[in-house]
């Protein structure tokens, strides 16, 4: 009987509860709409200007040339420093001046601290398992602390100086050897510099520069050049690959097999090589041979808090970051100096005044303001990362006098910031003097925003500046540089980056080496 009564009570309860639930739902709906309306009324900030686009696809066709930083900069001349575009189903807010970029990176950071990654970057970063692409959370704080403590912080940089000195000496020796053997032939700057940077990154990350390694998962032995391709070149190319589903999330269920297979294969090969390198070094550690490197630090200090996959990814990040961004800045700086004998000679005079007949070293860098200005000006004109990886607005905020809605993407156009005619006089010109004789302070490392700002400032900024400056200084001190035939017009860049599309080709001539003594 009780059971029957209970069964009879069900429809009665439903009959009473249905309207109650409906009324409650309607009430909550109106309350939510009222709160939204009040927020809009209380805000005196309008939405950003919109760049006109097409239905459904928005502004995608206007970005098809794959150099969005330049398109963004052109649009800023018409729509202002902050505006809104549509990339398919997504709303993107583009920031084009230092003021609004700093506001986003520092003042309003708490509202936009989440990274918005493409499908390719999600796979290649193992779902944000590296410092540069993670959200601002406990993993980010711990991982960055380990990176600074072991590798990139000031104290760690002093410990790794021996590796940098060896790298710079090797670079100079190779260029000098080429100049003596082939005095009239252009040298491929990137080939030499890139190889030595990769060696440095390997020493700092895993303890040694590996010439070859057997990779069990691939059942093959890889050369150093093959490792470089798998660990650096392929991921860099994959990171800028576009999956059309990124622009239409509601269609992500549709397969894109060619894209997925390509990126997953890069991911598999990268992991296979990193596992082989780590296992090789674990055997070295087990034998009792300790080396001051990132791997040894992570295994001794973070093995209990980080997974094996996270450790693998952090080590890979240290390799690819050191191998790539410093190269971009240094190659462009040498391009600019090679086509400008007057400024090259001015730098040489500064080095000679500071060092006399001694070889330039890191202690002397603080006495070379023009060299620092060359580094800063190259960062400004040829920023290694022209657009900061997208961020996600997880709560409504205000930027630059506009209301930024929740759910928007934020794109900080570093290239546009550094081409702002309201801040920089003749920004299209490479003119280091603007950082020496003007109001700009050459000690302000983040003036050009190339290394970000606030809590997400680039951990490798100090190392990048040190390596690039000492390399530029030593190369100018020991060699005379001029561009090869047709090289001055060779300024095309690779895809979404500011990488020089074709490696720098220069004619070099040794200076009076007997006047440069090793100190």
Swiss-Prot record:
Keyword flag Iron: yes
Transmembrane stretches, start-end: 11-31
Cellular location(s): Plastid, Chloroplast outer membrane
One cellular component (GO) term of this entry: endoplasmic reticulum
Native source organism of the sequence: Salvia miltiorrhiza
The protein's name in its UniProt record: Ent-kaurene oxidase
Family: Belongs to the cytochrome P450 family.
Annotated positions binding heme: 458
